[in-house]
Amino acid sequence: MVKTVALLTAGGLAPCLSSAVGGLIERYTEMSPETNIILYLNGYKGLLLGEKVLVTPAMRLQAHVLHTVGGSCIGNSRVKMANVADCVKRGLVKEGQDPRQVAADQLIKDGVDVLHTIGGDDTNTAAADLAAYLKAHGYTLRVIGLPKTIDNDIVPVRQSLGAMTAAEQASRFFQNVVAEQTANPRVLLVHEVMGRSCGYLTAQAADYYRAQLAHREFAPELGHTRERYDIHAVYVPEMTIDLKAEAARLRAVMERVGCVNIFLSEGAGINDIVAEMTAKGETVPRDPFGHVKIDLINPGAWFGKQFGGMVGADKVLVQKSGYFSRSAPANAEDLRLIKGMVDLAVDCALRGEAGLIGHDEERNGVLRAIEFERVKGAKAFNIDHPWFTHLLNEIGQPKGAKVSVAHGDE
């Protein structure tokens, strides 16, 4: 019997977190109503500080509402327990304490049998490490993770929770913002999309955007042309960018159409920006995981500055869809995916299994509990997907060479 389970969400937001929490509460209420459910607040921070809520009968009745909610109803944080100095600095543990021991003591104190972690590869492998640590100290904890990341970059998971919704929302964001190219002559409009080292979100958002564009009605005689509302370039970290060649191609677009619209993954060209900052002796801001804080170095503005003059733009406008996209509630496709994974997660918990729930690309796409030792991040977006190749051909953009990218973020 599983007496007590605990849930936490961690890493960046994605359009699945609240729904997954609600789904787990609903499924346990259905399959094992006697099981106690603990919600650790604000991710691993709450676990380390003992900040938690015990789910009440009234809360169970309200769980269905969470399927319509964005963000994380129980809060998130970015905490790397292996980074002891950062944990001490933030007041999560005291000097001389091991964060793993502090977390383990809290789980033992709370009598947790199963820990459900909803996050990316860092979140879930950290939980697996914690379970191994507890086992070595004589306490059995099963960890069952759910794969959350808008980058869809977890190996070997076919589709992570929230990524489809985030791409749809990025497309929706640009459906409004694209009209800004009419505010001034010769506008270079850069849509900066989240994606540290994976171009999935940028590419999928571009594909979704062009799909809806095909069904829109235009009035070319009145200046409302499809070309002005189309995408003229898509840049992702996994593909090289020949700046000079692209500038020449897009300058021709500017002369013909009167504007240039670009979908740019924030991770595209990040190495060039970091190298430039380092050469100037500037400090590159990083988070507790060692990842570059992309929002502070502003890739879109850097790219626009490099490109604006080359394409003959009178105005450069950079618009970021990241927070708009990742904070949305899950769409219908993601809700179906969440339901399937949540149901299996609870079933696995009650059967005594552990692992990261997902469609295993290395096991014929079967939905199963994937062994944690096989889980890792930085799954690159495949630029050779037929649909992406078709997209590039449609907009007249030559495909660049493949690029190996560094480990991503949640």
From Swiss-Prot:
Homodimer or homotetramer. This is Pyrophosphate--fructose 6-phosphate 1-phosphotransferase. NCBIfam families: PRK06555.1. The record marks 122 as: Important for catalytic activity and substrate specificity. GO terms for molecular function: 6-phosphofructokinase activity; diphosphate-fructose-6-phosphate 1-phosphotransferase activity; metal ion binding. Its EC number is 2.7.1.90. Mg(2+) binds at residue 121. It is found in: Cytoplasm. The keyword Metal-binding applies. The record marks 148 as: Important for catalytic activity. The active site is at residue 151. Catalyzes the phosphorylation of D-fructose 6-phosphate, the first committing step of glycolysis. Uses inorganic phosphate (PPi) as phosphoryl donor instead of ATP like common ATP-dependent phosphofructokinases (ATP-PFKs), which renders the reaction reversible, and can thus function both in glycolysis and gluconeogenesis. Consistently, PPi-PFK can replace the enzymes of both the forward (ATP-PFK) and reverse (fructose-bisphosphatase (FBPase)) reactions. Pfam families: PFK. Keywords: Cytoplasm, Glycolysis, Kinase, Magnesium, Metal-binding, Transferase. Diphosphate binds at residue 12. It catalyses: beta-D-fructose 6-phosphate + diphosphate = beta-D-fructose 1,6-bisphosphate + phosphate + H(+). The lineage of its organism: Eukaryota, Amoebozoa, Evosea, Archamoebae, Mastigamoebida. Non-allosteric.
